[in-house]
Every structure is written in C-alpha cells, then in structure tokens.
C-alpha cells in the first residue's frame, strides 16, 4: 500500500478534503502522494497546457488546491521598499484570479536568501479556512472568499527569510519558529481565534531551520515530528510535550519535510554535512544512541524532501543526484544524475514519480530498484516551488506564472 498511516492523521484530524484536493504542502498526506489517475506524463510550453497565468509579486510558496481554487502567497513591492504579503487564489478550471488580499505587511524587509524570500511557506486549507504564513512576518486565517478572520505574529530572527509551512491538526494550527541566536520554538494556535494554545521552546543550543512538521500515528498515539537545528523532535501535538528527540552535530538551516513509513521517520539533517537518518519512532527521551536504524551521507538532500513509494525511498539532492535506497535498511539500489539543480520536493501520482528542477525541467521515472526515464518536460522560467496535483491536472508555479497542465481529452 503506497500511503502509510500518516495519511489517516491528516485526513481524519485536519479537514474533509476529498480525493480531488491538494490542501497542504506535499498533498493530502503531507508525503507527496496523489491518488489521481490520468495525470499527464508529457508537457511543454506548447503541449498539454490548459492555462498559464501571470502571478503578481514574488514568492516560492507551493500551490494548494481545494474547493475549485488554487491558493498561493506572494510578496508585492510597494513604495519605499515595503512589501505587501498577500494571499492569492485562482479558479482551478479557468485560471481567473478570484482572491488577492493583503494578509500581512513588512515596511522594512531585511535580507532574505535568493532561494527564499518573504512568501515561501505554503498555505494550508482546512474546512472553510485558508491559513497563510509568512514566518516571523505574521500568520493569518482567511475565509475561502478571502476575508481575513484573524492575524497573529511571533517575532524571531529568521536570517534567510520565511520558510517552514504550518500544519492543521484538529483545531490547532502548528508551526516551527527556528531563528538565529537560540530563538527557537514551536507554537500551536487555535484555528478559530488565532490565540496561542501551547508553545514549546527548543532545547539549547538551537539555530535557524525552515522545516514543516508532520503528524504521524505510532501505536495508539499521534506524534508531531518537528525538525530543528541540531535535533529532531517528536512532540505530543495536543500539548507540545516532548516524546523523543534525536541529535545530529552539524545540522542546521534544515528545509526538507520529514517522511514516515515502515516505523521509521526519515530526517534530513540540513546544512554543513547533509545526512539522511532513519529513526525508529517508538522511543522515549534521547534516542540518539538507540533508535537510528541507518544513515545516508552520499547524495543526501539539503532542500528537497524525500519521497517513499512502497519499500523504496527516493531522494534527489540539490545538485540533481537521485539516490534510491531500501527504506528499511538504507541499502543503495542506484544513483543517477538527473541534471539541473533541485529545491522542489518530488511527487508520486498515477504510478510515476515526478522530479522538478529549478530550471523548469521535470523528469518522470517509474518506481523500482532500477532507474528508468519515462519523460523529460520543460517549461520556461525558474521552478523552486513544489507541484500540486488535483483533478487529474498538475499545477506548477514558476517565478512568473502559474500553470495548469492536463492531458488533452
């Protein structure tokens, strides 16, 4: 079975999203999987483009799809260097812009990494609410028609701009706040009011990280997997109380979202010496010496998240080397250079895995222990955001446009 128990946590606790929706970063399960069929294999600027529309401003938040709308965030420059941080939505069938509303504002934006910016976190849709997040610049809840319900802001020194995306768990909106100079914590807000329900400080030392949490089910208990600098944590998602933690010495500025399957949490340790570690999720306290099942250093990613399909884990690193390993043992099946540079996380749909480079090129492969290339598809512009899949269509955000890609009928 492709989708592991992590799928049930989101589907039961977060929203009533149907199979056509892609309501959060990395889809319904948060693992990059789609149940759609008829998803296009081939496309180009001249082929299988249902529509292509310009996107105002700048941002690398990935598209999410629910209720017939495609949502993203963007940062629009204004006078004297200010930025209007906006939520935008397009009609999924026509590409017509239907919402464009200011959710937050920055009068004096500081430095942001060229691969990041002020509109990198992906929206999350749950029920009749859309939650948009801009890191230390603020968080907001909107109605699906674009009315702002509440705003909140947690200040911390996010050196390279915004990054990690929130998640919805029941009536909680949870996100990481990992900044420089030991400012690092995780916070849960009431989805209805924006009021704080819990806040948990990271252990020291701490540093910057830009990750998205994941809720998994282990035995009879849910765990909030939250990746920070130097350590990854499992918390009780209702209270923020720590369940277990694992340490890694040289890891910070983490980006990939964790992946879960076969009882293992797959964690990318971040900058300096990128390493992928597989941690058994049934521990208590400090599990560094007891629960690491295997590690991978050759080909480990710094930015793209891994994807688990069956018994194989697929990781593409930032320089385009694809590594496929046995998920249980870490044994490498093959390594293959795809070409290009990578920030977007891969997706699995219709029996195929899609890897999208920063240069607008998507390589499509079959799952398995041997490499095969099914298609190579090219679009104009840069593509650092991850694709979304809904309604048998692929939605791709470039640095200037949003595409709906669909096989001709």
Report each predicted region and the residues it spans.
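Bacterial N-terminal signal peptides
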Residues: 4-15
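Noncatalytic, solvent-exposed loop/strand surfaces
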Residues: 17-409
């Amino acid at each position: 079975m492709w989708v592991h128990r992590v799928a049930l946590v989101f589907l039961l606790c977060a929203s009533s999203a149907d199979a056509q929706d892609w309501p959060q970063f990395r889809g319904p399960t948060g693992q990059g999987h789609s149940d759609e069929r008829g998803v296009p294999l081939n496309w180009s600027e001249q082929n299988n483009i249902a529509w292509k529309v310009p996107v105002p401003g700048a941002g690398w938040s990935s598209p999410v799809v629910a209720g017939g709308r495609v949502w993203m965030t963007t940062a629009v420059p204004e006078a004297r260097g200010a930025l209007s941080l906006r939520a935008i939505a397009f009609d999924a069938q026509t590409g017509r812009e239907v919402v464009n509303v200011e959710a937050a504002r920055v009068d004096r934006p500081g430095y942001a990494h060229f691969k990041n910016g002020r509109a990198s976190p992906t929206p999350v849709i749950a029920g009749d609410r859309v939650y948009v997040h801009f890191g230390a610049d603020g968080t907001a809840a909107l109605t699906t028609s674009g009315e702002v319900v509440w705003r909140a802001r947690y200040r911390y020194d996010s050196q390279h701009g915004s990054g990690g995306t929130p998640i919805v768990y029941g009536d909680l909106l949870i996100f990481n706040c990992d900044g420089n100079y030991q400012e690092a914590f995780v916070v849960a807000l009431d989805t209805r009011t924006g009021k704080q329900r819990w806040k948990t400080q990271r252990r020291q030392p701490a540093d910057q990280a830009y990750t998205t949490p994941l809720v998994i089910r282990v035995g009879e208990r849910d765990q909030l997997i939250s990746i920070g600098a130097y350590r990854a944590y499992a918390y009780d998602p209702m209270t923020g109380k720590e369940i277990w933690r694992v340490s890694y010495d040289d890891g910070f500025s983490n980006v990939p979202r964790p992946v879960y399957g076969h009882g293992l949490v797959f964690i990318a340790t971040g900058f300096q010496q990128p390493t992928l570690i597989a941690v058994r999720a049934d521990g208590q306290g400090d599990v560094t010496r007891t629960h690491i099942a295997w590690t991978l250093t050759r080909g480990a990613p710094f930015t793209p998240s891994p994807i688990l399909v069956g018994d194989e884990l697929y990781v593409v690193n930032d320089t385009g080397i694809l590594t496929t390993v046995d998920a249980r043992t870490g044994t490498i099946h093959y390594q293959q250079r795809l070409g290009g540079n990578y920030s977007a996380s891969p997706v699995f749909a219709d029996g195929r895995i899609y890897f999208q480079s920063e240069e607008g090129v998507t390589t499509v492969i079959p799952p398995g222990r041997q490499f095969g290339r099914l298609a190579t598809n090219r679009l104009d512009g840069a593509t650092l955001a991850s694709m979304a899949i809904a309604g048998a269509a692929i939605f791709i955000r470039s640095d200037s446009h949003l595409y709906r890609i669909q096989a001709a009928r």
